């Protein structure tokens, strides 16, 4: 470590060495040499921003340039040639390498903005490439391959955090650290901690801020560098002000396009966040006001102070110089960079890109009001040096008012967005009942057209979220029905309830003749239609419709897709009021019915079956007439697509077209039903029906409701037809 310090001392020179630099020996005027250095630094800043490299890379290239011209002369190596090579080298050192072609094109654009870019295949371009590579090698050899640079910005950040300086003071100090690299040769004379102390001291004088002495009785600069004294700070501050006064305004224009782009991007990312946008606007105003008047205030200080006077009051005469100095808008100054969080351990690599608007300090309020009030008071009353406590007490009310305003703005924005989000969630969560009106044919005159009785025979279907209501009673012309949408947790309970209701309903209508079977079948359909395969899967009894369903299963005319349509959707189907003859008279209408969600089993009335699982079936009571066997073909087609509520095609009203389309998208796909995870929960025992004898499950026919075993079958069941495709 000690050897490294001794080696680094070779790049710090005395005043005599600076006055005897190679350029001076070749006859270059001292002011001219300083101007050449400033112009080269300005070119590096411009090129770095166009190449989109970090401020750290630009500052490193500037230090390379300063050190290079302590060994070489401007007469042998012009600054416009060395600057691109220095930036090309610094970009690689700071791990932001740029293509050689890009560096040459950017340098050409900065030096010759009116000319077109050179052709990459031309002799002039190839010569520039060769010259830049040679200059890079010369810079490396001149610097002795010592490429690691320590910048004062790191120490500025640490010190401002140590003394808990305001944002305004930290921002100005950071800005002066960058100016020290661009405009002075402090990087060749003093170590980075000393330069950082000078920048902070200069910012304190300009802001009329005095950093108090610590509890140990030490000044703040003693914690940064023990070799720094107050006399040295005053001397270097005066020298800095003199250099600023002599520097042309065009060299003070330190552009920072990256900061502007980052600020625009930050505003674009704050989508509708009014509080953040207004806060960014306030910070931009602070940055612009401070950066616009920094150099002017410092130059006015230099006219009214001497190096022996530590306190520099800004008089009315000096403040009038603000109008005589040509200043650039604040967006071109480094201090207008967006706010970021700085960590001391990140060092200069992070802090170079910032303007210290986000430095942690004890004042949560912005220092803009303090700065503006000082600027206004300086025109009327000469400001004196005040302590930190007095300064805070003086501006406590203004800072508190500003903080309250920002808090109110933030609260308003949050409340607005919370209200909007709550309304959006409540809109999605609210499930009002949807009434579906679908005209159907009455049972009295099935041949009458739909349009004549659409107003009288409308089927109203109410779809609430929380089901459980009992179905409304059937009317001859209008049927009101609640379709229950089951949640995942309520499926099994609803299955048990519906099966129990179907058992009671079956006992109630047990004595009705078979020619009226379909009317009562669909009347009980309101209780158990969504659990048709469930009753068979759970081996529980159902109404007479279950016997016809299981007969279809035994003959494999009950397709799997129809069970999916009845179980996966978990919705109740619409009832029907047709007689048994209506189905047999219109098999063609049944085959092409695809407009509703109910399955119509139109077999003749069959006796009930035994209710105990595992008993053998009694098929002697099964008397399949010839018409019923003929209707199996349309029913096998019917299973491929759902039918209407009464077995015929149904029309839809335009009022609830969207809801009907949603139901159709779930229930009708011409036999191709969407598979859902819960679909297989209700048809789990379906494989048992593939072999009725082995599975012990019969076609469920019997003539009693008691749990006694039925008689043995007199003949085996008919052969099984092939499964539908």
From Swiss-Prot:
Domain of life per record: Eukaryota
Coiled-coil parts of chain: 383-424
Positions with biased composition (Basic residues): 506-529
Annotated Pfam families: Cyclin_N, CycT2-like_C
Keywords for this protein: Acetylation, ADP-ribosylation, Cell cycle, Cell division, Coiled coil, Cyclin, Host-virus interaction, Isopeptide bond, Nucleus, Phosphoprotein, Transcription, Transcription regulation, Ubl conjugation
SMART domains: CYCLIN
Transmembrane domains' residue ranges: none
Cross-link named Glycyl lysine isopeptide (Lys-Gly) (interchain with G-Cter in SUMO2), sites: 341, 414, 480
Residue ranges, annotated region (Histidine-rich domain (HRD)): 479-549
Essential for interacting with SIV Tat (site feature) positions: 260
PTM-bearing positions, type ADP-ribosylhistidine: 486, 529, 555
InterPro entries: Cyclin-like_dom, Cyclin-like_sf, Cyclin/Ssn8, CYCLIN_CCNT1_rpt2, Cyclin_N
Composition bias, Polar residues: 365-381, 614-629
Modified residue annotations for ADP-ribosylserine: 415, 473-474, 530, 548, 551, 562, 636
Localization annotation: Nucleus
N6-acetyllysine carried by residues: 389
Keyword Transmembrane helix: no
Function: Regulatory subunit of the cyclin-dependent kinase pair (CDK9/cyclin-T1) complex, also called positive transcription elongation factor B (P-TEFb), which facilitates the transition from abortive to productive elongation by phosphorylating the CTD (C-terminal domain) of the large subunit of RNA polymerase II (RNA Pol II). Required to activate the protein kinase activity of CDK9: acts by mediating formation of liquid-liquid phase separation (LLPS) that enhances binding of P-TEFb to the CTD of RNA Pol II.
Name by which UniProt lists this protein: Cyclin-T1
Organism: Pan troglodytes
Phylogenetic lineage: Eukaryota, Metazoa, Chordata, Craniata, Vertebrata
